[in-house]
Amino acid sequence: MKNITDMEKDRQYMKMALELAQKGMGFTAPNPMVGAVIVKNEKIIGQGYHRKYGELHAEREALAACTEQPEGASMYVTLEPCCHYGKQPPCVNAILESGIRRVIVGSSDPNPLVAGKGIRILKDHGIEVTENF
């Protein structure tokens, strides 16, 4: 079980991801606004948000912005990572390839193409997932 200090850190990083997501307001429709923060050894090594419809999703932008290898890191993302091909490839694939060990998800994705499948794929590959944070 996590201690209060760890939970507070998780809340702070998720708050940062939510603030990043808001930067996409007015540009992402019909997609949702999403933010992501990657933390390794209590240091932010990458962050991103979905800037515009058709462009990189928040998870891929955060991974591209990493200042060091994300292997073993935690990702805080406001919405469940996608697991289907659309304008962008599945974000779950990028997360799996990156070596991230833990994903904290703010909300599950109600889109029927995702709807829990992204979380299930991550868990099936041994990634620790905290849902609906």
In which residue ranges do the predicted regions lie?
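Short, N-terminal intrinsically disordered low-complexity segments that are rich in Pro/Gly
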Residues: D6-M7, K23-F27, G48-K52, L56
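Non-catalytic interface/targeting segments
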Residues: M1, L18, A29-P30, V39-K40
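Short, basic/aromatic recognition patches
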Residues: K9-A29
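Zn2+-dependent cytidine deaminase-like catalytic core
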Residues: I38-F133
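Acidic, glycine-enriched active-site microenvironments
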Residues: N31-V34, E71
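Short N-terminal amphipathic alpha-helix/helix-capping patch enriched in small hydrophobics
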Residues: P30-P32, A58-E59
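Short, compositionally biased leader-like segments
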Residues: M1-M16, G126-V129
